[in-house]
């Protein structure tokens, strides 16, 4: 931590951040090794570590990968809360377009390391211009409504 805090003050601040990311028993989590934590807990610890210096930008690279849907939802809610309360910009990197649609105001679509399309999320999702973007969006699983299935 790049501050003038004492060792005890740094520990106290770290435990406060673990509490802010909604980890139960933050004092215990502070003492644990990563292999002793679940995937969701490890993700929260990483978010707490990233937020401890009050950054203006948080880079969230695949923050929900390998997490079950319930924990994904909690991590997404946490990121939204951080964005809203701390006014921290979040660069959300993901292959999960349903999460991108839910979280992002602007979207960059990349292929082979190059940006192929960018713009406001609504524009990208509802009026994609590039064929690659259209194919990605077409691959998003859709819930089949009963009325559609019956007709």
What are the residue ranges of the model-derived segments?
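Conserved ABC ATPase signature
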Residues: 32-37, 41
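A short, surface-exposed alpha-helical micro-motif characterized by mixed small hydrophobic
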Residues: 100-102
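ABC ATPase "signature
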Residues: 118-119, 127
């Amino acid at each position: 931590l790049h501050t003038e805090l004492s060792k005890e003050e740094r520990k106290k601040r770290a435990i406060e951040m673990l509490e802010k990311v909604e980890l139960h028993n933050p004092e215990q989590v502070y003492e644990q090794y990563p292999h002793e934590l679940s995937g969701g807990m490890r993700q929260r610890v990483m978010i707490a570590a990233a937020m401890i210096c009050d950054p203006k930008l948080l880079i969230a690279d695949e923050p929900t990968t390998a997490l079950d849907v319930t924990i994904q939802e909690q991590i997404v809610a946490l990121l939204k809360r951080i964005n809203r309360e701390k006014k921290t910009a979040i660069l959300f990197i993901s292959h999960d377009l349903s999460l991108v649609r839910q979280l992002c105001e602007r979207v960059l679509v990349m292929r082979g390391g190059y940006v192929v399309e960018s713009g406001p999320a609504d524009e990208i999702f509802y009026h994609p211009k590039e064929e690659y973007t259209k194919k990605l969006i077409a691959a998003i699983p859709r819930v089949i409504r009963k009325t559609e299935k019956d007709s």
